[in-house]
Amino acid sequence: NLYGDIVSDLCAGLVGGLGLTPSANIGKDGAIFEPIHGSAPDIAGQHKINPTACILSASLMLAHLGEAKAAAAIEKAVTDVISEGKTLTQDMGGTASTEEFADAVIAKL
């Protein structure tokens, strides 16, 4: 697991950072979907976390549960918000808060 964690973190850096990368741990009897970045307690409550990884983890969960249409809609909304470049969090070069980014994604849905 150590090497998998290292490789996944390196790959996250290639796509823009840990704030963008969702994860899925799928086993025989269950599945867990979560951002790969962890809890980031040092910036908790500051409203500057990028929620993309969390939102996309939910999309992965919906796809796993057979809700492909809902999963695709969420992924498209996230992609559209990022592509527009108007409502980006600090880690993506913007000034939007966590809530502002999430609200922009919701508006796209």
Predicted segments, located by residue:
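Glycine-rich phosphate/pyrophosphate-binding loop and the adjoining helix
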Residues: 68, 77-109
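Glycine-rich phosphate/nucleotide-binding loop
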Residues: 1-86
